[in-house]
Amino acid sequence: MAFTANGTQALHAAVLGTLAGNRRAGSRLVHSSVEHSAVLHAAGGEGVPVAVDRHGRIDVEAFLSAVSSTDGVAAAALQAANHEVGTRQPVSDVAAALGDVPLVVDATQTVGHAPLPAGWSVLAADARMWGGPTVGVFAVRTGVRWRSPFPEDERESGRVPGVPDVVSIVAAAAALRAVVESQSAEAARQRTLVDRIRAVVPARVPDVEVVGDPVDRLPHIVTFSCLYVDGEALLSGLDRRGFAVSSGSSCTSSTLEPSHVLVAMGALTSGNVRVSLHRDTTEAEVDEFLEVLPVVVAEVRAELGADGL
């Protein structure tokens, strides 16, 4: 196990180190088309994407076929659950059939919220996601070939260069211990709230699509897209009313491209809202959000001249 400055660096280390350690097999990385951008960037031009269904889940046989039919596969990557829509992936089923091909698993959104899947070779996580400080962590199973992709450093057994932030690491461990103690009960509470959001939003807001698997998903994430709505305007309207949410389809100033996750799923990419519940999110706050949302959507549609559509 090794620690990094943040979760992105942990994912980079997990992917690049696994590819470097298995260079004799090749340089290709088979991955789902909805992996975190950090995984896609680390794979570079050597990535082999596998399509997902409307819920954002890969087909096990299709994934394994991509591994077996591609020359020079050094590793595979499959997230435990999606960071935008919450859909869980069949990691254990894939891992059981991969043979000697190592499997890198992004568990960033899963740790502290749900049990980890079995079978991973290299696993990466981010302490911020369970309430800790900005610390990334990755673990390599005994016997898995992994080589540091960073310049040589005598510290941390050469895995990660630089001096580890011991204070933050200890704080991250303490936070994880506290979260895991109540993980099951908190997951059940959050799942009930998310189920309410999934049911009420399409009932109160016309032309909306709730995305992600309705059952096999993380307990704290729910995402939906509203037709005839600008995502940034919707987020701003909700922010003014005290609700901090994000948008999986928000464009970056450099690429002006929608979320690759939503595109891969074939989902509506405009007017997207991602809600992530926290341990201190109350039922009353969810009810208030469900009252405010239809009003904000109507206001944004009116501003765009789409209220009569």
Segments and roles (model prediction):
Residues 1-309:
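Pyridoxal 5′-phosphate
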